[in-house]
Amino acid sequence: NAADEGTQSPYGPKFPPIGFKACLQAAKAHPNYTKPVPEGAGRGVAVGFWFNVGMQSSAEVNINENGSVMIIEGSPDIGGSRASMCLMAAETLGIDYDDVRAQVGDTESTGFCNVTGGSRTTFATGMAVTQACEAVIADCKRRAAMTWGLDEDQVEWEDGQAVPGPGVNADVKPLSLAELARKAGKTGG
C-alpha cells in the first residue's frame, strides 16, 4: 500500500516521484535481508512519513568585514536548529562552520515566521537561510565583476570565493568572502 507518483494525497495535490517502493525493493534484495536469521530471531522493516507544511519563515544573513557570518532568524531554537542554520549557511557559502553564528531575533528585528515546530522549522527556516546566502553569493559575484571589470556571468562562486570563469584572464585572482566584505564600502555598501 505504498504511495508512488500520481497517488492522490489526503491534503490536496498528487504526489510527485517518491522512490519509496524502489527503496523497499532495494532493501528486500540486499544480502543482509535475504540471509537466514538465527532461530528465535526475526527481521522487520518499519517506515514512517511526515509531510512538511512549509509555511513562512524569515532569515537575514549579514557578512562582517572579517568574512564571518551572522544569521538572524525568527524561529526560536528547538533541538539545535541554530546549529542547523549555521551548517546550511556554511555549506551554501562554502566557508567554515566556525565562521558562522546564528541568533534568534525578536519580532521587531526579523521578518514574520509561522509556528516553530520540529517538523517545520529546520526545513522552512533552513530554506530562508539558504536563499539569503544565495543572494549574498549573487551580490559578491556582482562586486567581484565590478572589481575585475568583467560581466557578472564571467564570475563563479567556489569554496567561499569569487573566481573568474573559464576563459577569463589568468591574472585575475580569486576574492574570498572576507576580501569582498572588506571592500564592500568601496563597491556600493
Task: List where the protein language model places each region.
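Cofactor-centric catalytic regions
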Residues: 1-93, 105-189
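Generic long, charged, amphipathic alpha-helical segments
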Residues: 98-104
